[in-house]
Amino acid sequence: MPNASRVALITGGAKGIGRGIGLELAAQGWAVAFCYRTSGDSAGETAAAIRTKGATALAIPADVSRPDDCERLVATVAAELGGIDALINCAGPYRRVSLLDETVAGWQEMFDNNLHPVFYLARLVAPRMIERKWGRIISFSMANADQGVAQPQITAHYIAKSGILILSRTLARLLAPHHITVNVISPGFVSSGSAPEEELQKMLKNIPAGYIGQVDDAVSVVKFLLSDEARYVNGANVHLSGGWGL
């Protein structure tokens, strides 16, 4: 299937890594739909930038922590663009708080916004991908989420991101017979606007590569995983950390 016939849905696509992915896919001829919750101005700017590349852009306000919003989101994209060939889960807030100071509401928020949307959306797009006999699902976790180490300051976030790995491997197993791959990208420190630059620079000494990752580094991995050249890559967890954590 040529890229001009393909449709991508990106959560958290108004800014940062999600925006970078959308712009790259637009340059490749994909139709790009993305959702946003509060970044209305950024969403408008991103949609306009996608259209300058000659691609179709569809920006949809949605709260992917809500199952009904996910249903509306998928239905809208399918109706407007004819289907969904790739789901790219970029949305997911990050919050630092000691586990001993965590609240029930704060704990629930991390799962509602990081893990649950991956399930909500996968169950909605999978039947459409099965029907088209092709599909890609890519989700963002976090570096060392597969190592099960103690994380006293980001416990809820870490466990939610770890859950994405298990969920994605299960989906990969179930969907493989239908020419659908499901993979995870686990970034370390990437300069995407979601974390203060001074905080990133403090971590530089722990990165063997000697520099902070950029949005384009993440985009390159997504670009490969979406390609037909990556058809045999399934259930993988790609570490995008410059060697951090080794």
Name each model feature, range by range.
Residues Q214-L240, G245:
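C-terminal substrate-recognition "lid" of short-chain dehydrogenase/reductases
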Residues A14-G16:
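Conserved glycine-rich cofactor-binding loop
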Residues S98-L99, G106-F111, M203:
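Substrate-binding pocket helix/loop in short-chain dehydrogenase/reductase
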Residues Q28-E45:
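Conserved glycine-rich Rossmann-like NAD(P)H-binding loop of the short-chain dehydrogenase/reductase
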Residues P127, R173-L174, R231:
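Alpha-helical segment proximal to the catalytic Tyr-Lys
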Residues I138-G163, S168-P177, F189:
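Catalytic loop of short-chain dehydrogenase/reductase
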Residues A176, T181, V233-G235:
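Short, small/polar-rich loop/turn modules that mediate ligand/substrate recognition or access, typified
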